[in-house]
Amino acid sequence: MIETAKVVVAVFILLGALICLIASFGVLRLPDVFTRAHAASKGSTLGVNMILLGVFFYLWFVTGELSAKILLGILFIFITSPIGGHLICRAAYNSGVKLDERSVQDDYNGIRNFVIKRKEDSYL
């Protein structure tokens, strides 16, 4: 039983490390801040949570203890990492950072123009 648990733990930790490695290549190779932030937030959300799940399963199966701290860490990263990536992209967009020329769609532009128009109308 313990050997099987160690294999499961190793798979989770190695898979998490592989996801983080792939995300780091994405951060280095992708063209603009928006796609880089996307790769970084996905890598941290999935990769780090897989590693923490591996640690949680190790503590549970091998040592027999359940760690609420690790579960809270998983929950914290699962919630805050996508929000942080979104806020970084939103701040970059609002400060005038341009999309890469290969980007085919700018979803935020229509909403931004609508909000600006609505603010102008409310001042009249």
Curated annotation (Swiss-Prot):
Keyword Transport: yes
Keywords: Antiport, Cell membrane, Hydrogen ion transport, Ion transport, Membrane, Sodium, Sodium transport, Transmembrane, Transmembrane helix, Transport
Cell compartments where the protein resides: Cell membrane
Regions that span the bilayer: 7-29, 44-63, 70-92
Keyword Lipid biosynthesis: no
Pfam families registered for this protein in UniProt: PhaG_MnhG_YufB
GO molecular function list: sodium:proton antiporter activity
GO annotations of cellular component type: plasma membrane
Membrane topology per record: Multi-pass membrane protein
Membership in a protein family: Belongs to the CPA3 antiporters (TC 2.A.63) subunit G family.
Subunit (UniProt): Forms a heterooligomeric complex that consists of seven subunits: MrpA, MrpB, MrpC, MrpD, MrpE, MrpF and MrpG.
Alphabetical list of PANTHER family matching this protein: ANTIPORTER SUBUNIT MNHG2-RELATED
NCBIfam families linked to this entry: CPA3_mnhG_phaG (TIGR01300), PRK12674.1-2 (NF009314)
Function of the molecule: May enhance MrpA stability, assembly, or function. May play chaperone or assembly roles for MrpA and perhaps for other mrp proteins.
Additional observations: Mrp-dependent antiport apparently occurs by a secondary, proton motive force-dependent mechanism, but the similarity of several Mrp proteins to membrane-embedded subunits of energy-coupled NADH dehydrogenase complexes raises the possibility that there is a capacity for electron transport that could provide a primary energy coupling option for Mrp functions.
Name of the protein this chain belongs to: Na(+)/H(+) antiporter subunit G
